[in-house]
From Swiss-Prot:
Keywords: Acyltransferase, Transferase. One of its GO terms (molecular function) is acyltransferase activity. It comes from the Archaea. Its EC number is 2.3.2.-. This is Putative gamma-glutamylcyclotransferase PH0828. Substrate binds at residues 13-16. It comes from Pyrococcus horikoshii (strain ATCC 700860 / DSM 12428 / JCM 9974 / NBRC 100139 / OT-3).
Amino acid sequence: MSYKEKSVRIAVYGTLRKGKPLHWYLKGAKFLGEDWIEGYQLYFEYLPYAVKGKGKLKVEVYEVDKETFERINEIEIGTGYRLVEVSTKFGKAFLWEWGSKPRGKRIKSGDFDEIR
């Protein structure tokens, strides 16, 4: 999958999810559904972030246009995340994983909704 295509699938797990502060970035995006991705751990320190490890991560999968993807990617990459490709039940999708060592509190369930 290439992010140069007309539309791109993304998997989001934190502040871009429904009901979260940055979900407005996904206005007009096509919601494909929820999934759990194996091989990731969720942490929280001011912001949520996922790192590779033993665990699972709850994601929402969307199809977005190229412009939306590029806008989100610029923000995520600029704050320390890196873009990776993951497998979901909806097909391959891009996910932003944390680019450094884990810190903060681990959310063992892998679900950002547990953070209040």
